[in-house]
A protein has these predicted regions:
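Hydrophobic alpha-helical transmembrane segments of membrane proteins
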Residues: 1-92, 100-186
């Protein structure tokens, strides 16, 4: 079965992320670790929220807040902020292929959005569970989270395109010593 160039590039991005533990543990693992910590705090009873919080979350502000939580968790993976830097050793090969650079960037953005979508679902799902949001409010929050995550990932990809970390000795350095990830956290 013949695949499109975009699908092949997206599969390449996914394989590269899964093949290198440093990429996976220093990036997408963060979006799993944060909700896990908050979940443990909630279950242990150490996460105490004022009673007014539940009331606030039932209104329209709850949709925006849950969406912002989902967007934050979805954007913490750093996949887009290190997309070009992780390919630094292969840039000459990539430039020599008869494909427009637009396709490479679209695949990198789609890869980042796969993780952002997962993180947004985790963040909005956790907020919906914690504050008993209605399905309609949760769906609205998810749309907000995905929109904000797309915006953040576009900014991160542009930042890494303009200022990539091209010289690194180990794959870990491409992710851990990259200031683009820290900049995108803020």
């Amino acid at each position: 079965m013949r695949r499109s160039a975009f699908t092949a590039l997206l599969r390449r991005e996914i394989r590269m992320m899964n093949r290198e533990p440093a990429y996976l543990l220093n990036g997408p693992f963060t979006m799993l670790l944060l909700p896990l910590i908050y979940g443990m705090m909630y279950l242990s009873g150490s996460l105490r929220l004022p009673p007014e919080t539940a009331e606030l979350m039932q209104g329209n502000a709850g949709i925006v807040i849950a969406g912002a939580v989902g967007a934050f968790i979805g954007s913490t993976s750093g996949v887009a902020a290190t997309a070009v830097s992780r390919d630094a050793k292969n840039l000459r090969l990539i430039k020599s292929l008869p494909l427009p650079m637009k396709r490479f960037m679209q695949a990198k953005l789609a890869h980042a959005m796969l993780f952002a979508g997962t993180g947004a679902c985790i963040g909005v799902g956790g907020s919906a569970f914690l504050f008993s949001l209605t399905p309609l409010h949760a769906a609205g929050s998810l749309m907000i989270a995905l929109s904000l995550a797309l915006f953040c990932n576009l900014l991160a990809l542009m930042l890494d395109t303009v200022h990539p970390k091209l010289h690194w000795d180990t794959p870990t350095a491409a992710v851990k010593h990259n200031l683009n990830t820290v900049i995108m956290f803020f």
